[in-house]
């Protein structure tokens, strides 16, 4: 027997909106273990993820889908993560990008930030720092997303 719900009960309707409005992150790293770690961590934060192994795949995914956040490795098989940051700044300026690299020198961090990266992480990735970075990026992006939704 099905229980009836009051006509004003919006719990189920609101729940379905929440489930379909998940934010999406693009992860670019040529190391499968790092990609998997990032996918699992962001998935537990209720983000959908897509992954690319190189610049070419990343550009293809960016052209096909909308993303709320991008995490990219500095050194990729077909170029530099800085190239991707510059591409995103030109084509998708509202998309926050964080650089992840094993080469954690101050010069590298400054280069990433000058290119337009939102933030910078070093490998091995500190998961607490990653979660903070992701939460901050999504909070800062929220006003942009709300403005884009206004007719």
Could you describe each region identified by the protein language model?
Residues 32-50:
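Two-component/phosphorelay signaling modules centered on CheY-like receiver
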Residues 54, 80-83:
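Acidic catalytic/metal-coordinating carboxylates
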Residues 60, 75, 82-94, 111:
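Short amphipathic alpha-helix used as the core "switch/output" element in two-component signaling
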Residues 107, 121, 125-135:
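C-terminal output helix
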Residues 73, 101:
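Active-site residues of response regulator receiver
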Residues 35, 77, 105:
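The feature encodes the CheY-like receiver
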Residues 26, 51-69:
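Acidic, metal-coordinating helix/loop segments flanking the phosphotransfer/catalytic sites
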